[in-house]
Amino acid sequence: VFTPEILDEMFDIYKQHKFFIKDKNGKEIRVEDTRHMRSLKFRECLQNYFKDKDISFNFLGDGTNRMALLIDGYVYKLALDDQGYIDNLTEFKMSREAQPYVTKTYETNGLFCVAEYVTLISYDEFVKQKMRILEILDILSSEYLLGDMGWTKKNYCNWGYRKNTKDLVILDYGHMMRVDTNKFICSECGGFLSY
């Protein structure tokens, strides 16, 4: 889908840490919200690229650290900052081992990750599926530390249904990591660490 040239351009935008806009008098003003400005620059760049290539796509929306696009039936998650980049790498790493409870992530270069498209659930559906969600979280929490996917109202949009099987899965799991019991033991005294 992406040429090496557009990937280079996207990486240049990603690496940019200073953004300026012009006020009504033409004076340049530095914008502090680099994540938001990066999102706007990415959108502009991608719209032009897809128009030139005659590729249909949809912007699915922005999250805290990534934006999502739907291209040819796949979700492309684009990192808006360093945490989004790490989230893409994490999801690629965790995807295979956390099946069937998370969306499949097929590939990543850090900036983008390509993932399975699932149907987002509504808040009402989230409430109806409470027992199944808690069951999935309980299964995963036996081996993983889970972030940003628990049973709270703000996390309902991190869940969806697989298209073919209608299985309930987590679609944003960039803050998930395997439990490493060595990290709970002090390397100096051997005592238990609490966080």
Locations of regions flagged by a protein language model:
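Protein kinase catalytic-loop region centered on the HRD/HxD motif
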Residues: 142-150
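Catalytic activation segment of kinase domains across protein kinase-like and atypical kinase folds
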Residues: 149-195
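Conserved structural core of kinase catalytic domains
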Residues: 80, 96-137
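Active-site beta-strand termini and strand-to-loop segments that position acidic
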Residues: 69-73, 117, 162-163
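Short, surface-exposed coil-to-beta transition loops
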Residues: 64, 108, 153-157
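ATP-binding glycine-rich loop module of kinase domains
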Residues: 54-103, 110
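ATP-binding glycine-rich phosphate-binding loop
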Residues: 2, 6-72, 81
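Intrinsically disordered, compositionally biased low-complexity regions
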Residues: 3, 10, 47-55, 59, ...
